[in-house]
């Protein structure tokens, strides 16, 4: 099939600036490049780092870049925003969509994949004969979404990253075979413990060999539950060997600018400054070196996290997981790999108790670690890509 993929209009693909959703796109584009299943054109914002990316040499995948950052593009975006007030997305995203649409209308695509942007369907209405597929990684289409029925009806297929997201879509309707779940995957070869002599020593992270080091990785934002984790650490103030490594910043790739929440968080952690280290943003390729230093991963999301890759990465590194009964998280783990907590009024206290329990029971951690390694094999990027393209077969026979 001849396929167009409309990206989010925020981060570039290939994923030279990171972003989980952009990484997922890279995975199935890489798979398509190897197996040559379809002819795919990706519509993405431009970034200078894509210029010499090897993905651009593919014979089956091509890229159409929209400039949104040059001074001329910024002027055009500003003018666009002045004349378009009632927009479904931010005017910068809508500008990207308009520029991409100018090219799309010249092409005869069989299928257009709207990547995490189901609202794009409004702009495409009546302007293409292609079938629309929504590829959802977040809760962006449910009964509370603006124009939800119109958007739902416009799709030939809706692929979601978890049953949680699929069930949210089904609050609108449950048409036969329209909704399918395809679990995301990760680079298992990257996230594996390897006997290397890297420069990341435990002492650099403020811990010794006899310490119990926990890791939190992800965006340092309120909904990720990091404040509750710090509060749990404060309840464990009399346990000097329990330490925490916080990996991440408030936004992807942002190593310098701290928002008010991050500043408040560090102030709260001040009494435990010798036991909590904030690494800031860590490049994706360096993440395994940090994770392998930890004994346990704590991912205490207090919102309905659709399918956080941090859970998959932790299990692939053989880390026992402490997380929550929110969103798609229960779909990523088993009772043998993780301890899941309710985010109720007792959450912080129960989080502290769970941390202390794993600290005091190394044999339990060892069993959970072995189970995590085994379970993680279900979430390879290859299986993800294969299942994604298998889902597309549902509509292939109906394409002209």
Walk through the language-model features, giving the residues of each.
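Nucleotide-activated donor-binding/catalytic signature segment of Leloir-type glycosyltransferases, i.e.
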Residues: 126, 258-282
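Conserved donor-binding/catalytic core segment of Leloir-type glycosyltransferases
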Residues: 159, 208-224, 230-233, 245-247
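Carbohydrate-associated surface elements
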Residues: 164, 185
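A short helix/loop element that forms part of the nucleotide-sugar donor recognition site in Leloir-type
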Residues: 192-207, 387
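A short, well-ordered alpha-helix in the C-terminal region of glycosyltransferases
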Residues: 350, 357, 364-378, 390
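Glycosyltransferase donor-sugar binding loop
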Residues: 243-263
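Acidic donor-binding loop of glycosyltransferase active sites
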Residues: 292-306, 319
